[in-house]
Amino acid sequence: MALLDLQAMDTPAEDSFGELRTGSQVSLLVCEYSSLSVVLCTP
């Protein structure tokens, strides 16, 4: 239970960083492999 409690306490920060990482990875994949890359990835 102690491990679960510690994980529950650590999740907010880890989730926010995890979302940023996965978001950037997804955007890179979309830019590389999607036909919408011109629309989504142009500055």
Curated annotation (Swiss-Prot):
Primary role: Lanthionine-containing peptide devoid of antibiotic properties, involved in the formation of aerial mycelium. Suggested to self-assemble at air-water interfaces, thus providing a film of surfactant through which nascent aerial hyphae can emerge. The aerial hyphae differentiate further into spores.
Keyword Cell wall biogenesis/degradation, does the record have it? Answer: no
Post-translation changes:
Maturation involves the enzymatic conversion of Ser into dehydrated AA and the formation of thioether bonds with cysteine. This is followed by membrane translocation and cleavage of the modified precursor.
- Designated name of the protein: Lanthionine-containing peptide SapB
Residues with PTM 2,3-didehydroalanine (Ser): 27, 37
Q: Which UniProt keywords apply?
A: Signal, Thioether bond
Looking up Pfam families in the UniProt record yields: RamS (PF19402)
Q: Where is the signal peptide?
A: 1-21
